[in-house]
Design a protein with these regions (language model features):
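PRY/SPRY (B30.2) beta-sandwich protein-interaction domains
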Residues: 1-211
């Protein structure tokens, strides 16, 4: 590895992230019509200047089993998190969930998917999250039927098969903010979230509250 030497940083301000121990972050190079301010080493997508602001991650997933965590920030409602394909353009809609192929949840208990038109579930798909809850997202790209699972504080709350348009495609972690309503993300490296249990994923990588 070729690693840089850090200075004037506390242990809480950095984590190991090398070519052989690399973690996902939010990617400021993905362009949307409205974009958040990405900071804190790519783990915070903060309010910029528009109602609906979107971010996609640095690592696209085509196979394997993947896990990441998030905590809701701000008023609960109208912030979305999940996965999205890459697509050719992210600039033709004010709402990023209405682009490419998308699967997300909203923390009040609804599930959404987009494949040319938006499909919205009824309310009560799961108990609403609070700002103290940990949301775990587990993506299985290896099984014959690819799935995404959502966990609340370590307990499974929702399982969805990937929509047919997503099967076999490259997908990315994705979020859409609503004003200052967002999620603080933990892809396994540095995170703004305070972790008490320091669990690793099934392959022994990352630091998570649950895994």
């Amino acid at each position: 590895d070729n690693d840089l030497l850090d200075s004037n940083l506390s242990a809480a301000d950095h984590s190991t992230d090398t070519p052989t121990n690399n973690f996902c972050t939010w990617n400021s190079s993905w362009q949307y019509l409205y974009e958040p301010i990405i900071s804190e080493g790519g783990t915070k997508a903060g309010y910029h200047n528009s109602t609906d602001e979107n971010a996609k991650a640095t690592i696209g997933l085509t196979n394997g089993k993947w896990y990441w965590e998030a905590k809701p920030v701000g008023t609960i409602g109208s912030q979305f998190i999940g996965i999205q394909t890459d697509g050719d353009s992210n600039l033709n809609s004010a709402q990023g969930i209405l682009l490419n192929y998308t699967m997300v949840i909203e923390p009040q208990g609804r599930y959404y998917s987009y494949a040319g038109s938006l499909s919205e579930s009824s309310a009560g798909q799961f108990t609403a999250l609070t700002t103290s809850d940990w949301l775990g997202i587990a993506l299985d790209m290896d099984s014959s039927t690819q799935t995404i699972k959502y966990y609340k504080n370590g307990s499974l709350i929702l399982t969805r098969d990937l929509i047919s348009e997503m099967q076999g495609r490259t997908v990315f972690p994705f979020l859409q903010n609503y004003e200052s309503r967002s999620f603080y993300i933990n892809f396994g490296g540095y995170t703004l979230n305070t972790i008490s249990s320091a669990a690793s994923d099934a392959n022994g990588y990352g630091t998570f509250e649950y895994a």
